[in-house]
């Protein structure tokens, strides 16, 4: 796990500026988003300095990924949709936030709501985001009250407000039983499941957040391309059209 964290730090340090430039090219970053990106880079640099900067990975990054069984994973859309997107997310990641307030809404309208794509949510909380694990467990706990996607959306839009009190406040606004939610989060009952997602992300070659598998539905699984970063809708649209042929 430590090796994964160190490698992820290096990969994120390389990927963040590229995604930031892509975001700027799409219409510019807000001042707040720019500040979040700078803060992310500073945190990564500080952790790399403490752990010792790793050598740049020499192996070529994987471009394909396959998961055979997504049974039990939180899903939006029709289970019979011909195409699948799996996201590995970190609720404290500013680029995950950017994806969900931009490209995701377009994907949902064009593909998920029309029955063409089923969208699965998995977790990849990074160690240098202290509130990310709590948020991942909170979303799963919200699922017990049939509010997984609602709480996920609110937390994803507020990556800097993921301490326990803010999460409970979000839950209250969503008319959830906040005592039940707090008890569930405190129990750590979903921690092992979140960590299983992280190990799976390592196995397929994910090296930053958000990471996606975009491809054909194969039974209860997916076989497709590995995509890293908050890419624009146009990129997802092109890949989905390619897999629709």
Where are these regions (language model features)?
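Positively charged n-region of N-terminal signal peptides that target proteins for export
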Residues: 1-4
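Extracytoplasmic thiol/disulfide redox context detector
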Residues: 21-127, 195, 240-245
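Solvent-exposed, polar/charged alpha-helical surfaces in well-ordered, non-transmembrane soluble domains
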Residues: 32-35, 39-42, 46, 86, ...
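Short clusters of hydrophobic/aromatic residues that line enzyme substrate/ligand-binding pockets
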Residues: 76, 162, 227
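A structure-centric signal for secondary-structure junctions around beta-strands
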Residues: 80-82, 135, 209
């Amino acid at each position: 796990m430590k090796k994964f964290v160190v490698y992820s730090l290096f990969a994120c340090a390389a990927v963040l500026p590229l995604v930031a430039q892509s975001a700027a090219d799409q219409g510019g970053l807000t001042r707040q988003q720019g500040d979040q990106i700078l803060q992310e880079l500073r945190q990564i640099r500080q952790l790399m300095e403490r752990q010792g900067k790793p050598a740049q990975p020499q192996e070529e990054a994987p471009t394909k990924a396959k998961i055979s069984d997504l049974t039990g994973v939180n899903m939006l859309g029709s289970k019979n949709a011909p195409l699948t997107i799996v996201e590995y997310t970190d609720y404290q990641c500013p680029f995950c936030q950017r994806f969900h307030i931009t490209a995701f809404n377009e994907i949902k309208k064009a593909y998920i709501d029309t029955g063409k794509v089923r969208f699965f949510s998995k977790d990849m909380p990074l160690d240098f985001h202290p509130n990310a694990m709590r948020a991942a467990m909170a979303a799963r706990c919200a699922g017990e009250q049939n509010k997984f996607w609602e709480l996920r959306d609110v937390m994803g839009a507020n990556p800097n407000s993921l301490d326990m009190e803010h999460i409970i406040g979000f839950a209250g606004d969503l008319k959830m039983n906040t005592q039940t939610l707090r008890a569930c989060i405190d129990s750590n009952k979903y921690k092992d499941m979140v960590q299983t997602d992280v190990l799976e992300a390592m196995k397929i070659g994910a090296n930053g957040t958000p990471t996606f598998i975009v491809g054909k539905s194969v039974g209860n699984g997916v076989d497709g391309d590995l995509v890293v970063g908050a890419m624009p809708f146009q990129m997802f649209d092109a890949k989905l059209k390619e897999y629709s042929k």
